[in-house]
């Protein structure tokens, strides 16, 4: 059995699709989507707008429980990245590759990083950079890398219902600096114009990079840079209808 989601702006087209599909195979139409591939859809529909919030709270809660962190106090003001403790500055593991401690740590670390990656690529762009850093150490993680990954997991525990939201009548917060704030910003302009459908359906992209090391220190010219260190990070995100539809946070090649 396969699940799928479909949509149409025209009720007649949607009805035709349902009829033709039913004639060809056995199918159950279950109404407005609430769960799909572990993602929860929360809808708020009014006469003037349609709003939806997507999160993976169930997956996040199960992940926290699998590492027995559910009793830890929540700290929703935290971030997934420990300020002042750069992941690249963590001392490498000194355990032999075939030692029991290293094998256990590697298995747990890879499992956790894979789960964090699933969250960060689906509904949690806020964890993309931390996941990118940690992914560099899946081959031989040290205990410090595991602590950093568990710090991200504690952040997930504190923000398990975070996700991404979309609305039918919102506009992107910025199109370019010369048009900021946009003419639809009622807080900025007393004569603000109401957003139109064309405003809402506009793609707006942002990109940035940190120039250099996350260690925060300079090195002399000609210094040989270690692998996975001192490389800039690229970041980018694309918005549509008030929410992100694509993002990345990764090291430059």
PLM feature segments, named:
Residues 1-26, 42-55, 136-144:
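Catalytic palm subdomain of template-directed nucleic-acid polymerases
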Residues 1-16, 24-33, 119-130, 246:
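Active-site palm subdomain of RNA-directed nucleic acid polymerases
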Residues 5, 40, 174-176:
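Conserved beta-strand/loop block within the catalytic cores
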Residues 27, 41, 205-207:
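Generic structural motif
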Residues 29-57, 84-89:
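Short, conserved secondary-structure transition motifs
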Residues 60-253:
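Divalent metal-binding acidic/histidine catalytic loops
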